[in-house]
Every structure is written in structure tokens, then in C-alpha cells.
Amino acid sequence: MVTVNEFRKAQRAEGPATVLAIGTATPPNCVDQSAYADYYFRITNSEDKPELKEKFRRMCEKSMINTRYMHLTEDLLKQNPSFCEYMASSLDARQDIVVNEVPKLGKEAALRAIKEWGRPKSKITHLIFCTTSGVDMPGADFRLTKLLGLRPSVKRFMMYQQGCFAGGTVLRLAKDLAENNKNARVLVVCSEITVITFRGPNDTHLDSLVGQALFGDGAGAVIVGSDPVIGIEKPLFEIVSAAQTILPDSDGAIDGHLREVGLTFHLLKDVPGLISKNIRKSLVEAFKPLGISDWNSIFWIAHPGGPAILDQVETELSLKPDKLKSTRQVLRDYGNMSSACVLFILDEMRNASAKDGHRTTGEGLDWGVLFGFGPGLTVETVVLHSVPT
């Protein structure tokens, strides 16, 4: 008869959790940021607010975003005029859309990850689904299981209303699942659409306008597992460690509240300062055990909450301009897609590394960091190790 310790040892994987495939998806509707102020004020019937429109135009210009993708088309907004008001009761109509569309967009990203992975869907043992766009029972994880045709016994985890830091959270959870369950293959999906947050402008709530200028729709998916099957599975990044912390003196810096009017966001101007002031401590705690203290010697995947956050992090840590290249590229092409962003940046980095002839998936470097920032202020710090391209 085996002992408990022997049984537990046999249950666990030998190697570190590894990202084995990545997939991304967006709605087909692409929005030109340079024309968005005119469109937004027209579709929300707010042309009588020229000064506010000019403020919003400047926000869009400073966002460093070129394009975003949105499920909400002009036709859909005309069918739901309450979405275009500032604070109209509209949650039912918003929910009717997101409970269907969030899993569907997640499915598109998941299928691309599964195709790259190259193994049967029946080998997926766990599913982690994350969204800040609506809530439902059974959840989006259940709907995605049905849409993909996963085994009914797949072990599901549903994360609602976590916000922008959760792209790090899902990797932290996937790491623990993969390393503590031998042969586990974890499908991770983050799917976000702005149907739940879109609303018209108001000059007393400028932080809401900031969100209207930054947020876009997208879904990212990864498959995580330990001990890759040689010749079948292709490792992309190893997940070495993961930590979460609440920043000091940051209560109320980023808040989100689900109300009859949808999901409202409240942001303090000091968010970039709070993050940049505390980021060094998170880096030291994560990399001191590895003997790393040069932040330019690692590759960077940082949630692009907005250009001000990235600029202040660069300044605080004296980062070279190219350190946040992949992060800024995703912000430029897609905007802030909340939890899905860092998965898009992972994809951008491994693709750019191969295209540019780097020796590893991490821009030729061995070690890297993935940061998630969001409500709390909460910070997720994930240490990654790249693999040869």
C-alpha cells in the first residue's frame, strides 16, 4: 500500500508550468482612434458639448492608440439608445449581449490556441475563464465548455469582475494547477467587451471619459502545462513564480461598480504615480532569489493601462525605450483590453522575437516579467523564462 506522501508525489508534475500555445481574437468592427471623438459625440447625441468634445479629442490623441476593436457597432447602439446616455438604466440590455458574446469571442481565441497546441481538445483537463464584462449563472466558463465541446468533466474556474490585473492572476492560478496535477493541460481564456462600460459623456465624470478613450474589446487564450510532450508540444514561456500584492495607500485609486447603468469605473489621477512608486519593490521581491537586479536585462510584458503608466514606469526604473516595445505595440493596435492585454503582449513578443531573429521568445533574453495592474490597486507579478526560438 502506498503512503499519502508517495501518492501526492505521483500526482505532481516534475517541471515548471509552461505556456504551450497562445491565441487571440477581436470583433470584426475596427475603430479609428483619430476619428473616434467625432463618432462618439455624434452617436451619443452630445454635439451640444463642444468643450467636452475637445477634451475628449485630446484624450484620444494622447492615448497612443491607433485602432481599437469593438463589438458595439453604430447599428447596435441605435438599437439600444440607453447605452448612449450617461447614466440610463440599461443593465438588462447590456447583460443580454455580454452573456452570449463574451464566451463566443473567447471561443475564437481558444480555438486558435488549441490549433497551435496541436493536441485533441479531450486532453484539456482544466478551464480558467476570466471576464469583467457581465455576470451569469451558469457562468461563461460553462458556456465556453459547451461551445468548444470540452469534456463535461473538465475542471472549471470562473473569475468575474477582477479587472485589468487579472491577466496575471489567471497565469498564477494556471501555474499552480499545472504543477500540482500531473499531465494537466489548462486552457486559460480572458474575454472582454466594452458593452458593459460604454456610455455617453458627462463633464462631472471625466474619469469615465478616460475609459471611453482607452478601452477596447479582445480575447486572449493560452494553454499551460508542465512536462511538455517532446515532438508534439512546443514550449513558449516557462512560468517560474507568481505573486500578488495590494499597493499601500491606494484604496479607491481604481474602482468599478456594477449598477443598473452598467459597469462604472472611477480612476484617480495618481494611479500612474502609485504604480511607478511601488513597482521596484515588486521586482526586487520577485527577482532577488534569481540574482537579478538590472531591469534592462529582462524582457517586459506590462499591462498597458495607459501611456502615463508606461511612461512613469520607464522613468522610475530607467528602462531603455525598447523595453516596453511589445506592450506599446499592443496598446497602439488594440487599446486597453483589460485582463486580455497581457496575453496579446505575450503573443506579440514571441512573434516579434521570431521575426527579428532573436535566439529566444523573450527578445533574445532569458528572464522576463509580466505585470498586471488593476483595481485595489492590485499588482500581479509573474516571472517568466523564455525558450529558444
UniProtKB/Swiss-Prot annotation:
EC number from the UniProt entry: 2.3.1.74
Keyword Acetylation attributed: no
Key word Transferase present: yes
Listed SUPFAM superfamilies: Thiolase-like
Any single Pfam family the record assigns to this protein: Chal_sti_synt_N
A GO MF term: naringenin-chalcone synthase activity
Catalysed transformations (reactions): (E)-4-coumaroyl-CoA + 3 malonyl-CoA + 3 H(+) = 2',4,4',6'-tetrahydroxychalcone + 3 CO2 + 4 CoA
Superkingdom to which the source organism belongs: Eukaryota
Associated pathway: Secondary metabolite biosynthesis; flavonoid biosynthesis
Residues annotated as the enzyme's active site: C164
Known role: The primary product of this enzyme is 4,2',4',6'-tetrahydroxychalcone (also termed naringenin-chalcone or chalcone) which can under specific conditions spontaneously isomerize into naringenin.
Family in the record: Belongs to the thiolase-like superfamily. Chalcone/stilbene synthases family.
Listed name of the protein: Chalcone synthase 9
UniProt source species: Daucus carota
Lineage: Eukaryota, Viridiplantae, Streptophyta, Embryophyta, Tracheophyta
